[in-house]
UniProtKB/Swiss-Prot annotation:
It comes from Rattus norvegicus. It is found in: Mitochondrion outer membrane. It is a peripheral membrane protein. This is Mitochondrial fission regulator 1-like. Transmembrane segments: none annotated. Belongs to the MTFR1 family. Keywords: Membrane, Mitochondrion, Mitochondrion outer membrane, Phosphoprotein. GO terms for biological process: aerobic respiration; mitochondrial fission.
Length: 289
């Protein structure tokens, strides 16, 4: 009998007292022995210097086990590795995994990657949302500035403020100039630009009766004239301060209302769009008439 022929276990002793139930079943049933497992071994394993180790391939010589990821404990018998962390694979292990053997670790990593939340995607979405909100606020500021410059007309002052400024026509231009600025341009420096207070002769030219009475008093005594002129100037300055206070209160009220509207960019944009469409409708109606 040849050496390569495999002999089933039930054919060793065809008869005798040592025959068991397994041998009896094997002789009666058409069973075949399982084929031997064949592994892919490293090439030229017989040429390696194995010292006293017999050149018989074992599981340590199988290529796909030695080259597997994170399996530093698996090594070829020809390698000399005293420690695991200092191990480097030999050039003979650069081989592909056997296609018949499934790579379970790779499938597990893919499943874990699918189960984990997409943190980079979430961070990107949050960054995009922040950038969009910043851009929306900038657009709202620009639109509000344009709308303020377009809507600040002479009608900005109400009837009360126009009545207050009516006895002083020389200051109407200054009040009208302050309304043409944007909200951010209205500062305390605008008060410096108010023209100088008119002198007493201007007041006399405005009211001739007052000039006659003052002329009589000046003829009486120069000291009384100085006192009266000082009292007139102080009363006029007090009147100007009161007018400035009225105008400042009016501006603060209008600014507070506009600032409340400026808090929400969406409200500003919708208001500007509403005005724009209203102007378009007015133009269309005028053209139609």
């Amino acid at each position: 009998m040849e050496a390569n022929v495999t002999i089933p276990i039930w054919q060793n002793k065809p008869h005798g007292a040592a025959r068991s139930v397994v041998r009896r079943i094997g002789t009666n049933l058409p069973l075949k022995p399982c084929p031997r497992a064949s592994f892919e071994t490293l090439p030229n394993i017989s040429d390696l210097c194995l010292k006293d180790v017999p050149p018989v391939p074992t599981l340590a010589d199988i290529a796909w086990i030695a080259a597997d990821e994170e399996e530093t404990y698996a090594r070829v018998r020809s390698d000399t590795r005293p420690l695991r962390h200092t191990w480097k694979p030999s050039p003979l292990i650069v081989m592909q995994r056997n296609a018949s053997v499934p790579n379970l670790r790779g499938s597990e990593e893919r499943l874990l990657a699918l189960k984990k939340p997409a943190l980079p995607a979430l961070s990107r979405t949050t960054e995009l949302q922040d950038e969009l909100s910043h851009l929306r606020s900038q657009i709202a500021k620009i639109v509000a500035a344009d709308a303020a410059s377009a809507s600040l007309t002479p009608d900005f002052l109400s009837s009360g403020s126009s009545n207050v400024s009516s006895p002083l026509p020389c200051f109407g231009s200054s009040f009208h100039s302050t309304t043409s600025f944007v909200i951010s341009d209205i500062t305390e420096e605008t008060e410096v630009e108010v023209p100088e207070l008119p002198t007493i002769p201007l007041l006399c030219s405005a009211s001739p009766e007052c000039c006659k009475s003052e002329h009589k008093t000046t003829c009486s005594s120069s000291e009384e004239d100085d006192c009266i002129s000082l009292s007139k100037a102080s009363s006029f300055a007090d009147m100007m301060g009161i007018l400035k206070d009225f105008h400042r209160i009016k501006q603060s009220q209008d600014l507070s209302r506009s600032l409340l509207k400026e808090e929400d960019p969406a409200v500003l944009i919708s208001e500007v769009l509403r005005r724009k469409f209203a102007l378009k409708e007015e133009d269309i109606s005028r053209k139609g008439n």
